[in-house]
Regions:
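Substrate-binding/catalytic cleft of secreted carbohydrate-active enzymes
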Residues: 1-94, 113-116
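Acidic, His- and aromatic-enriched active-site or binding-groove loops in soluble protein domains
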Residues: 93-107
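Beta-rich accessory regions
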Residues: 106, 110, 116-119
Length: 119
């Protein structure tokens, strides 16, 4: 089931745990909007808010679940599409919507924790 609005709870076990679709924070970047309505799983009002929410999602929701066996992630979604503006890149693929350094830092923190736990 999709889990956009509920706490993430990975239970330790003998199987691989994957978060196969998460994120979906909408923000229509000015000058790069798709031609139709805008949709996402929660809406940010600015690039700064989008970046902050991405960091918080990674730090407070995903990172703590690594110790329980979370092993794979798929962020929704890579780029905006006609009816959804919840991508990391704009509809025209011309701009990364959140701050690149902040995204890199959040992702590197996940990678470092995963490496620490799986050594």
């Amino acid at each position: 089931r999709h889990n956009y609005f509920y706490p993430l709870r990975v239970r330790p076990g003998k199987r691989v745990a994957a978060l196969s679709e998460y994120g979906g924070i909408a923000w229509p970047m000015p000058g790069h909007e798709p031609p139709r309505r805008t949709y996402g799983y929660g809406t940010a009002k600015s690039r700064a808010e989008l970046t902050e929410r991405y960091q918080k999602l990674q730090r407070d929701t995903v990172l703590p679940q690594l110790k329980n066996g979370l092993s794979a992630l798929v962020y929704t979604q890579v780029s905006d599409v006609e009816d959804e503006v919840n991508g990391l890149f704009t509809y025209d693929r011309a701009a990364l919507k959140p701050d690149p350094a902040a995204v890199r830092a959040a992702n590197e923190a996940l990678e470092a924790e995963f490496e620490r736990l799986t050594r």
